[in-house]
């Protein structure tokens, strides 16, 4: 997809660095980094590992490359204006081998053909799934969907 392989490897290895960390520790890392969570973020602990992960990688590992940090930060929600690296990490996480959901195989095949269409399909699935279960939808996911639809 034209991304930097070294950055992709780094972001790929580190994107879930805080996933198995206790939520209170994640909150501490975010607080110490000066991150104020939105109301939607406060209500969805599943998003915390991405936010705290980017903060941890910056403060504890000393990685300051904004593209890598943003790929980690937005790998769960996406966002408008995603870089190639952000797109790669987002869809790689979404289609990883352990992910099982209705349509997973179709999406995994689509990513081999068209990154944009795969991201749109992933975002569509996420938005429908969350809305169908009465869960909040992060504004960044909606912005990512609209941006991909309008600008590719």
Predicted segments — roles?
Residues 128-152:
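Charged phosphate-binding loop/patch that engages nucleotide di/tri-phosphates or the phosphate backbone
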Residues 122-127:
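C-terminal beta-signal and terminal closure region of outer-membrane beta-barrel proteins
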């Amino acid at each position: 997809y034209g991304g930097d392989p070294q950055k992709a490897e780094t972001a790929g290895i580190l994107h879930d660095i805080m996933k198995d960390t206790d939520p209170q520790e994640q909150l501490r890392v975010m607080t110490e980094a000066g991150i104020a969570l939105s109301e939607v973020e406060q209500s969805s602990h599943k998003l915390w590992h991405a936010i705290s992960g980017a903060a941890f990688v910056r403060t504890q590992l000393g990685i300051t490359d904004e593209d890598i940090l943003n790929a980690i930060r937005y790998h769960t929600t996406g966002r408008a204006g995603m870089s190639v690296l952000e797109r790669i990490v987002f869809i790689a996480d979404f289609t990883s081998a352990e992910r099982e959901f209705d349509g997973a195989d179709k999406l995994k095949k689509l990513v081999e053909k068209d990154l944009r269409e795969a991201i749109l399909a992933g975002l569509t699935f996420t938005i429908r799934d969350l809305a169908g279960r009465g869960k909040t939808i992060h504004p960044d996911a909606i912005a990512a969907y609209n941006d991909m639809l309008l600008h590719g």
